[in-house]
From Swiss-Prot:
Gene3D superfamilies: 3.10.50.40, Trigger factor ribosome-binding domain (3.30.70.1050), Trigger factor, C-terminal domain (1.10.3120.10). Its EC number is 5.2.1.8. PANTHER family: TRIGGER FACTOR CHAPERONE AND PEPTIDYL-PROLYL CIS/TRANS ISOMERASE, TRIGGER FACTOR-LIKE PROTEIN TIG, CHLOROPLASTIC. Residues 163-248 form the PPIase FKBP-type domain. Belongs to the FKBP-type PPIase family. Tig subfamily. It comes from Ruminiclostridium cellulolyticum (strain ATCC 35319 / DSM 5812 / JCM 6584 / H10) (Clostridium cellulolyticum). This is Trigger factor. One of its GO terms (biological process) is protein transport. It is an enzyme of class 5 (isomerase). It is found in: Cytoplasm. GO terms for molecular function: peptidyl-prolyl cis-trans isomerase activity; protein folding chaperone; ribosome binding. It comes from the Bacteria.
């Protein structure tokens, strides 16, 4: 096999690959064996015609497609490995020469991983995040706990106020006609939460139990349902109950009820410790992010658009999966947000480009600094994963493919490199 490599444009190479006749003949024979049952040749039962007869009857071109796929795929893989080429997309294949008793010649044009020009990366200056927890932070968090443990109690001696929970029946009408999804019974609506259409909740303030209320609202122009967008609507509402939050008494008994501690002081001390741990973790993440951005900002790399597009694809798939866990799908989300798929993808572009650059720059530093995952690193990572999934380590190992192990090694090297950069950074 002969290979010529030419840089045809920025981050794009073209390989001219020549495969000898014998190798192409092997591909033709494999194509014949794969397709022989598809050919009808007079005088032969289907699938029994010899190859030379099929080629004479249909022309040898009838076997070219699969032969090309078989031969070109193997030749291309060998060529990029031998020439240390790192493609980031599928190649564009063009046949230059093909025929009986001829070497197969084809070109493969492909986008490759770009070269990274590193700037300063060891000892970079970055803003230091502090892990401070104030008394005010503690009180705010404690108040959330108290609110969470509040109970709703009915009130009958006053009208609805902001912050109350109103239990209502309602039915919506547009032009005096009920519309789908506009009806509910025994619905608990927190007044002032903004859960319903703008203006709906405000019109219930001052109303009493058993009141029938006509609520007039306008759906937003981009509400998410075409039949409701911008429409005027009337809701017939019955006030069935008014509830208010009753906060628990904050004392040692409260601490005992919600925790393993006997006193309120012990509970608050534990809460402060947890807040401090959380603040410390956040500060570490923020410091890491500051260092990474400083390092990446000092580097130069011309990122191929295809790498950004692929990363956007992955981000969109991940977003869609998270939506499905919440009982939504991407199409419904786009309707609610009043956008289309292209607009949705575009919102990821800047972040995707930044994340691709981070990946490329850190990979380059790993290579320059000879940062690698050791066997012990890989073993530890596999053990952690097995424990997380409550699976025996040896069973998990059996499921790992070579590419899975390669991914684990690369990920470990990536994280080790970032740690080196952070440890050597000047945080101030």
């Amino acid at each position: 096999m002969k290979v010529k490599v030419e840089n045809v444009e920025k981050n794009v190479v073209q390989l001219e690959i020549e495969v000898d006749t014998a190798k192409f003949e092997e591909g033709m024979q494999q194509s014949y064996l794969k397709n022989v049952k598809k050919f009808n040749v007079p005088g032969f039962r289907k699938g029994k015609a010899p190859r030379n007869i099929i080629e004479r009857y249909y022309g040898e071109q009838a076997l070219y497609d699969d032969a090309i796929n078989i031969v070109c795929s193997e030749a291309y893989d060998n060529a990029i490995e031998e020439n240390n080429i790192n493609p980031v997309d599928r190649p564009e294949i063009d046949i230059v020469q093909i025929g009986k008793n001829q070497n197969l010649i084809f070109t493969a044009k492909v986008t490759v991983k770009p070269e990274v020009e590193l700037g300063a990366y060891m000892g970079v200056e970055a803003k230091k995040a502090e892990a401070n927890v104030t008394d005010e932070d503690l009180e705010n968090e404690f108040n959330k706990v108290v609110e969470k443990n509040a109970r709703l109690v009915s009130v009958t001696d006053r009208p609805i106020q902001s912050g109350d929970t109103a239990v209502i029946d309602f039915e919506g009408f547009i032009d005096s006609v009920p519309f789908e999804g506009g009806k509910g019974e025994d619905y608990s609506l927190v007044i002032g939460s903004g859960t319903f259409i703008p203006g709906f909740e405000d019109q219930l303030i001052g109303k009493n139990i058993a009141d029938d209320v006509d609520v007039n609202v306008s759906f937003p122009e981009e509400y998410g349902k075409e039949e409701l967008n911008g429409k005027e609507a009337l809701f017939k509402v019955l006030i069935k109950e008014i509830k208010v939050k009753e906060l628990p008494t904050v004392d040692d008994e409260f601490a005992k009820d919600i925790s393993e501690f006997d006193t309120l002081e012990e509970y608050k001390n534990d809460l402060r410790n947890k807040l401090e741990e959380s603040a410390k973790s956040k500060a570490e993440r923020d410091n890491e992010e500051s260092v990474i951005q400083a390092v990446v900002g000092n580097a130069t790399v011309d990122i191929p658009n295809v790498m950004v597009e692929k990363h956007i694809d992955a981000m969109a798939r991940d977003f869609d999966m998270r939506l499905r866990y919440q009982g939504l799908d991407l199409q419904r989300y786009l309707e609610i947000m009043g956008t289309d798929f292209e607009g949705f993808r575009e919102q990821f572009r800047e972040r995707a480009a930044n994340e691709v650059k981070i990946q490329l720059v850190i990979e380059k530093i790993s290579k320059v600094e000879n940062v690698e995952a050791t066997d012990a690193d890989v073993e530890e990572e596999i053990t952690k994963t097995a424990e997380a999934y409550k699976q025996p380590v040896e069973e998990l190992k059996k499921t790992l493919r070579p590419e899975d192990l390669e991914y684990v090694k690369n990920d470990i090297a990536f994280r080790k490199t970032i740690k080196i950069l952070v440890d050597n950074a000047k945080l101030n």
